Amino acid sequence: MDHLPMPKFGPLAGLRVVFSGIEIAGPFAGQMFAEWGAEVIWIENVAWADTIRVQPNYPQLSRRNLHALSLNIFKDEGREAFLKLMETTDIFIEASKGPAFARRGITDEVLWQHNPKLVIAHLSGFGQYGTEEYTNLPAYNTIAQAFSGYLIQNGDVDQPMPAFPYTADYFSGLTATTAALAALHKARETGKGESIDIAMYEVMLRMGQYFMMDYFNGGEMCPRMSKGKDPYYAGCGLYKCADGYIVMELVGITQIEECFKDIGLAHLLSTPEIPEGTQLIHRIECPYGPLVEEKLDAWLAAHTIAEVKERFAELNIACAKVLTVPELESNPQYVARESITQWQTMDGRTCKGPNIMPKFKNNPGQIWRGMPSHGMDTAAILKNIGYSENDIQELVSKGLAKVED
């Protein structure tokens, strides 16, 4: 198979990935593949472009490195072109409501007739099967968080709160990426493809698993705490200093002993409530948990972030300043690792945003292209799978494809 014009780089060079999906979750999986060197084809509706395009800046990050194909994949010759594309595809990712592709006649079995080795990743809010009440419902970040038990665990003691920005979408996209790569490994070993059913709510169920295990195995549910504190452990979570916020984790025998001396609680050490060798102070089970929080709050409020960081470094207590977004690009760690980078958009503008992650030493990722325009690569992709200029124009004339103006 000849590939589309693009530089060869990254650990996934030579891999062809196709995705159909809008907004964030499914496309984030495609973004990861594209930044790691795969040839990634982004399918958009012919009449209406991906709704993400209305955002002024984010699409330049989320759709960089992609090849844009505008094709009606469910109708007549457009469907035929899509199935022909599948013959040369390694991984196909679709994000929709439940078994939307199967309902429109594109089942796993149809795809495997054209490519027995194809890895298919279905990403939806509630999965490909289940009850009629849920399976076909639309889902976004907050829906998946609410249905999974994740949202109810977060927020303030008086009110739950979803995690932003769009946590469930990103976790689900990463799950699609890793699952598809696992399936590809097996498909190349056996010659038999795989179909993956990724339900966003199940992804978030796993993300919220830590505290849930106490309920499932004893009936006790961890309460939400106020002001960003850890629900279980004192000295862990968000705290306010004289000039801003830090997060800290008071974990370890020596760390607790030295911290207690600083905040005036040394007399509690080696007591029945806080015996020698204590590594964590349980906020609920330890009767002194509230007192530890009170004293720690007072001590931190009397010191600047710089003073706290210096002292905690001496005590080997993990902590970090809560950075504002404007502080990121000047932070020395960000600068040293080039965590924020720049690239050129298709119209020649400079765009700034997060760099590729993670960092591969021997086969690094690369930003080689900005976000393509709607239908920009339709002709090149169709020619790549054997279509002539006349074939392409016929698809366009029937409203089944869109090429760049």
UniProtKB/Swiss-Prot annotation:
Example GO molecular function: L-carnitine CoA-transferase activity
Active-site residue numbers: D169
InterPro entries: CoA-transferase_III, CoA-Trfase_CaiB, CoA-Trfase_fam_III, CoA-Trfase_III_dom3_sf, CoA-Trfase_III_dom_1_sf
Swiss-Prot/TrEMBL catalytic activity: crotonobetainyl-CoA + (R)-carnitine = crotonobetaine + (R)-carnitinyl-CoA; 4-(trimethylamino)butanoyl-CoA + (R)-carnitine = (R)-carnitinyl-CoA + 4-(trimethylamino)butanoate
GO cellular component: cytoplasm
Residues reported to bind CoA: K97, R104
GO biological process: carnitine metabolic process
Documented EC number(s): 2.8.3.21
Entry keyword Plastid: no
Annotated Gene3D superfamilies: Crotonobetainyl-coa:carnitine coa-transferase, domain 1, formyl-coa transferase, domain 3
Intrachain S-S bonds: none
Subcellular localization(s) per the UniProt record: Cytoplasm
Domain of life: Bacteria
Keyword Lyase among UniProt keywords: no
Keywords: Cytoplasm, Transferase
Pfam families for the chain: CoA_transf_3 (PF02515)
Pathway info: Amine and polyamine metabolism; carnitine metabolism
Function: Catalyzes the reversible transfer of the CoA moiety from gamma-butyrobetainyl-CoA to L-carnitine to generate L-carnitinyl-CoA and gamma-butyrobetaine. Is also able to catalyze the reversible transfer of the CoA moiety from gamma-butyrobetainyl-CoA or L-carnitinyl-CoA to crotonobetaine to generate crotonobetainyl-CoA.
UniProt record similarity statement: Belongs to the CoA-transferase III family. CaiB subfamily.
Subunit note: Homodimer.
Protein name: L-carnitine CoA-transferase
